[in-house]
Amino acid sequence: AMDHTDAKNFLGLIEYGNQNINSAQNCYWLESSLTMFPVEQVELLCHLKNNDWKLSKTNVDTVIESMFIANSDGKSLYGKTGTGRVDDININGWFVGFITSNDNDYFFATNISLSENDNQFLSADGLSASKISLSILRDLGIYAYEYQSE
């Protein structure tokens, strides 16, 4: 397991957002002082895919493989969702990822959030962010993916 100091050092190595994990010793990835902008998420994914940090190839490959979602028309979709909750309400949704093909790689990050004026019964979560991302990627002709009904 990674202790607080190791986690802070690793976040510094990969330049993860503001690197501030002081407000929550064990849950810093949740709604806390650790923040990151979508463009920083895209930069992080580019560095991860290229292993610019010179981490163990096996570890990097394992992380990337864990992000695999689907193949379509010779393209592979990789992604990760995230949901921030406060008072049992989903207030922050993320979907970050990339698409690989023979011609090009595409990186993306979508963040949605609820404001104080939003209807309390709506939700900003990772699933919603992923649906928005995939709709945009489809509209741009980059990747066609359809969610299967549950």
Indicate where each model-derived feature is located.
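Mid-domain, small-residue-enriched loop/turn segments at the edges of structured enzyme/sensor domains
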Residues: 1-50
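Structured C-terminal helix/loop/strand segments within mature extracytoplasmic catalytic/sensor domains
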Residues: 1-3, 42-150
